[in-house]
Amino acid sequence: IEVLLGSDDGGLAFVPGNFSVSAGEKITFKNNAGFPHNVVFDEDEIPAGVDASKISMSEEDLLNGPGETYSVTLSEKGTYTFYCAPHQGAGMVGKVTVN
């Protein structure tokens, strides 16, 4: 599945913001708007035993240009909340359920 970082109208959002994947399915986050974005999984909002640092971008790393991507594969079933570190305060948060 491809998830856009930033809506077509420049909104600070993940599109889609709430989605499901199968365990082992690749998720590609793609910068859509040209604002600097990243993908950080919330260590308190992921399945127990999953290391957030192994699936997240560093909070300092950014996808700066349109078309830049970050891919991750989640193998542990459950619900994962993620956010864009620079824009978390603006509500740029998403959720993926791994089945």
Swiss-Prot record:
CDD domains: Plastocyanin. It is a peripheral membrane protein. Residues 1-99 form the Plastocyanin-like domain. It comes from the Eukaryota. Its cofactor is Cu(2+). Its main location: plastid. It is found in: Plastid, Chloroplast thylakoid membrane. Belongs to the plastocyanin family. Participates in electron transfer between P700 and the cytochrome b6-f complex in photosystem I. This is Plastocyanin B'/B''. It comes from Nicotiana tabacum.
